[in-house]
């Protein structure tokens, strides 16, 4: 089955796994998904992830979700820019999530990064998702 929005599919899998209190969730691998997971890991929203490749050439990412005293660290994770409606922001218009308690993830010419990092590097881009 083909997926029209691979990043949205990964975020939905994470949201569903957190709702069911799962410790791990797997998703097909891609470079964009891995870069977004790098940001989530650096910001402390997931424990980590491992990428494995199968004999048929397909790769899969297994994501270890993070909990603090039984409560999921990820409370809300939403896709902003979708295949049918791309959302681009300048450095001045990067939104704050939950008054700075959450993060936005952007795809910029300098790579995939969190909102505060994009402000530091003075670069805008496509607003991929918000995490709180």
UniProtKB/Swiss-Prot annotation:
<dbReference type="GO" id="GO:0005840">
    <property type="term" value="C:ribosome"/>
</dbReference>
<dbReference type="Pfam" id="PF00410">
    <property type="entry name" value="Ribosomal_S8"/>
</dbReference>
<comment type="similarity">
    <text>Belongs to the universal ribosomal protein uS8 family.</text>
</comment>
<keyword id="KW-0699">rRNA-binding</keyword>
<comment type="function">
    <text>One of the primary rRNA binding proteins, it binds directly to 16S rRNA central domain where it helps coordinate assembly of the platform of the 30S subunit.</text>
</comment>
<dbReference type="GO" id="GO:0003735">
    <property type="term" value="F:structural constituent of ribosome"/>
</dbReference>
<dbReference type="GO" id="GO:0006412">
    <property type="term" value="P:translation"/>
</dbReference>
<keyword id="KW-0689">Ribosomal protein</keyword>
<dbReference type="InterPro" id="IPR047863">
    <property type="entry name" value="Ribosomal_uS8_CS"/>
</dbReference>
<dbReference type="GO" id="GO:1990904">
    <property type="term" value="C:ribonucleoprotein complex"/>
</dbReference>
<dbReference type="InterPro" id="IPR035987">
    <property type="entry name" value="Ribosomal_uS8_sf"/>
</dbReference>
<protein>
    <recommendedName>
        <fullName>Small ribosomal subunit protein uS8</fullName>
    </recommendedName>
</protein>
<dbReference type="GO" id="GO:0019843">
    <property type="term" value="F:rRNA binding"/>
</dbReference>
<comment type="subunit">
    <text>Part of the 30S ribosomal subunit. Contacts proteins S5 and S12.</text>
</comment>
<keyword id="KW-0694">RNA-binding</keyword>
<keyword id="KW-0687">Ribonucleoprotein</keyword>
<dbReference type="InterPro" id="IPR000630">
    <property type="entry name" value="Ribosomal_uS8"/>
</dbReference>
């Amino acid at each position: 089955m083909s997926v029209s929005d691979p990043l949205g599919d990964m975020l939905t899998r994470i949201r569903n796994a957190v709702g069911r209190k799962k410790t791990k969730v797997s998703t097909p691998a891609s470079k964009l998904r891995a870069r977004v997971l790098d940001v989530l890991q650096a910001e402390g929203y997931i424990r980590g992830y491992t990428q494995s490749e199968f004999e048929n050439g397909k790769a899969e990412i297994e994501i270890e979700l993070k909990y603090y005293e039984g409560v999921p660290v990820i409370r809300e994770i939403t896709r902003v820019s979708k295949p049918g409606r791309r959302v681009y922001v300048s450095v001045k218009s990067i939104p704050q999530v939950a008054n700075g308690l959450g993060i936005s993830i952007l795809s910029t010419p300098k790579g995939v990064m969190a909102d505060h990092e994009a402000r530091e590097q003075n670069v805008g881009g496509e607003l991929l998702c918000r995490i709180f």
